[in-house]
Amino acid sequence: MSALRLRKVDALLAQATRELGAGQSLGFSAAGQDAELTLLPLLADAGEPAGAVWLSTAIGPLLLSDAEALLSLLGDIPLTLGGEQQAWYWQLFNQRLSPTVARLLAPVEPLHNKPQAPTLGCRVQIRRGGEQLHAHMHATPDTLLRLLRSASWQARTRTVDESWSVASPLIIGEMSLTREQIASLRPGDVVLPAHCQFDSAGQGFLSLAGRQWAAQTDQHAQRLFLRLSHEEHRHHEY
């Protein structure tokens, strides 16, 4: 049997992906309307979108698809990227950004030198009034981390299918035996663990997902049930 080989993932990339999770949402207001900016993971690996625009922001460089429409929804005035880019125009645009977005991104301005570091992509959704926009954003992992840590984003959660089950071994005790002792065991032999996880009343502890939980076993109709009551904290966690 060949060993399972997992691809190596950069630690910063893994951290950014984990913080993005199932998605993060940020509420804001613009042009007198309540709005919401949402970042979501890509459904599949995708390269940088054609026609996207690199922009310099306070948290780092961002690559945006459909940048004109996206940025226009983040403030009180429409944005155009056509024609000659003048400093006064971008200054006005930044002044009319939603205060929430301005604290996060301003100053926003064109970026002429594309970053050479690998980027991480995500989907962008904006809802404002009756308008809705879907776009893509790419950024380096450290820029995405700064983006997610520089405002009061709200993590999105996914409903877990009730039919989904997780199998975990129930360890009732532990002991060490030599090979000779194991070979000598016969059906019906009684083995007493040196370290017991449960007592004779069915009360004990279960290690699950790196945590320890107080547990109680019950038997009904020839079936064994296990009930977790609360998490047991280790002394160093206080």
From Swiss-Prot:
Domain characteristics, as noted in the entry: The HrcQa-C domain interacts with the hrcQb C-terminal domain.
What does the record note on quaternary structure?
Interacts with hrcQb.
> Which of UniProt's keywords are assigned here?
Cell inner membrane, Cell membrane, Membrane, Virulence
Q: Which cysteine pairs are joined by S-S bonds?
A: none
> Which residue ranges does the record annotate as region HrcQa-C?
66-238
Name the GO cellular-component terms: plasma membrane
The primary location reported for this protein is: membrane
Role: Component of the type III secretion system, which is required for effector protein delivery, parasitism, and pathogenicity. Probably participates in the formation of a C-ring-like assembly along with hrcQb.
List the protein's name.
Answer: Type III secretion protein hrcQa
Domain of life, per UniProt, equals Bacteria
The annotated topology with respect to the bilayer is: Peripheral membrane protein
> Where does the protein end up?
Cell inner membrane
